[in-house]
């Protein structure tokens, strides 16, 4: 069940990376990018904790937030 939920959560991220991201300028302040971070977090920690980590990261990605190298814990 967790594998199916992870797959469902990853589909919109892959769609964003393939179809939307190429049409917009790079804007992520972190390395790896927020979408790559979300993929890694969901694959490493599962759908629940991975989604939590991804949302936290996306909320930190703004002009007044941090920047630089921020790997998945």
UniProtKB/Swiss-Prot annotation:
Main location: membrane
Compartments reported by the entry: Cell inner membrane
The keyword Lyase belongs to this UniProt entry's keyword annotation: no
Any Pfam family: YidD
GO terms under cellular component: plasma membrane
Top-rank taxon: Bacteria
Keywords: Cell inner membrane, Cell membrane, Membrane
Function statement: Could be involved in insertion of integral membrane proteins into the membrane.
Entry protein name: Putative membrane protein insertion efficiency factor
């Amino acid at each position: 069940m967790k594998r199916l939920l992870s797959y469902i959560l990853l589909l919109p991220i892959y769609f964003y990376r393939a179809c939307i991201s190429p049409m917009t300028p790079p804007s992520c302040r972190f390395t790896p990018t927020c979408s790559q971070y979300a993929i890694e977090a969901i694959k490493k920690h599962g759908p629940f904790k991975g989604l939590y980590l991804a949302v936290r990261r996306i909320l930190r990605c703004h002009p007044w937030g941090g920047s630089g190298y921020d790997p998945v814990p």
